[in-house]
Amino acid sequence: MMKLKSNQTRTYDGDGYKKRAACLCFRSESEEEVLLVSSSRHPDRWIVPGGGMEPEEEPSVAAVREVCEEAGVKGTLGRLVGIFENQERKHRTYVYVLIVTEVLEDWEDSVNIGRKREWFKIEDAIKVLQYHKPVQASYFETLRQGYSANNGTPVVATTYSVSAQSSMSGIR
C-alpha cells in the first residue's frame, strides 16, 4: 500500500504501519557518541535521523539514504539493532548502526530546511529523546541490552512496541 507525500511515496506493511528506516550514526566504532539532527517540525528538538522507505527499497538502503539526506553523513552500515514499533504513530522502523566515515559540509536538509546536527554522548542522547521521542530513546536501551545479553555479541531484537503512555510511566 502507498500514500503520496509531498516529496515521496509512503509505503506501508500488511498491518497498515508506515515502513521506516533509521541509523544510530556513531562517530567511531567505540559507539560512545551518536549524531542527532534537529526535528523538521520542532527545530529545538533532537531526533535520530531516519524516514520512510520508498517502494521496493530494502530497509538497509533506505536507512543509508535517509541519514545522508537528513544528517549529511556517510559511513559503514553495521548491524540491525531491531525493528521498533510506534503504535501511536503507526510506524515500524528498522534501526541500524552506522559508523560515520564522511561528514558533508552541506547536505540536502541543511540547505532546504536549515536542519542542524550535533554529536551527543549516549546518555545525553537518551535524555534529549526520552520525553518527546520515547521510542527513539528505546533504540539505545536495546543496543545496550544486545551487548550485555550475549557477552558483547549483539542480539538482533525483534519488534518492540512502545506506546507513549507505557514509556512515560517509567520516567521520573
Curated annotation (Swiss-Prot):
User: Which Pfam families does this UniProt record tie to the protein?
Assistant: NUDIX
Annotated Mg(2+) 1 binding sites: 50, 70
Q: What is the effect of changing residue 75 to A?
A: Loss of diphosphoinositol polyphosphate phosphohydrolase activity
InterPro entries on file: DDP-like_NUDIX, NUDIX_hydrolase-like_dom_sf, NUDIX_hydrolase_CS, NUDIX_hydrolase_dom
Where it mainly occurs, coarsely classed, is cytoplasm
According to the UniProt record, one GO cellular component term is: glutamatergic synapse
Cofactor detail note? Binds 3 Mg(2+) ions per subunit.
**What are the entry keywords?**
Acetylation, Cytoplasm, Hydrolase, Magnesium, Manganese, Metal-binding, Nucleus, Zinc
- Provide the active-site residues from the annotation: 69 (proton acceptor)
Question: Mutating residue 82 to A has which effect?
Answer: Loss of diphosphoinositol polyphosphate phosphohydrolase activity
GO function term, MF aspect, one? manganese ion binding
UniProt tissue specificity: Widely expressed. Expressed at higher level in brain, heart, pancreas and liver. Also expressed in placenta, lung and kidney.
Quote the record's activity regulation: Endopolyphospahatase activity is inhibited by NaF, NaPPi, beta-glycerol phosphate and heparin. 5-diphosphoinositol pentakisphosphate (5-InsP7) inhibits its mRNA decapping activity.
Ranges for domain Nudix hydrolase come to: 17-142
What's the effect of swapping residue 84 to Y?
Induces a strong decrease in Ap6A and [PP]-InsP4 hydrolysis, while it only weakly affects PP-InsP5 hydrolysis
Motif position, Nudix box? 51-72
Domain of life, per the record?
A: Eukaryota
> What is the protein's quaternary organization?
Monomer.
Return the similarity comment.
Belongs to the Nudix hydrolase family. DIPP subfamily.
This chain belongs to the protein called Diphosphoinositol polyphosphate phosphohydrolase 1
Q: Which organism is it from?
A: Homo sapiens
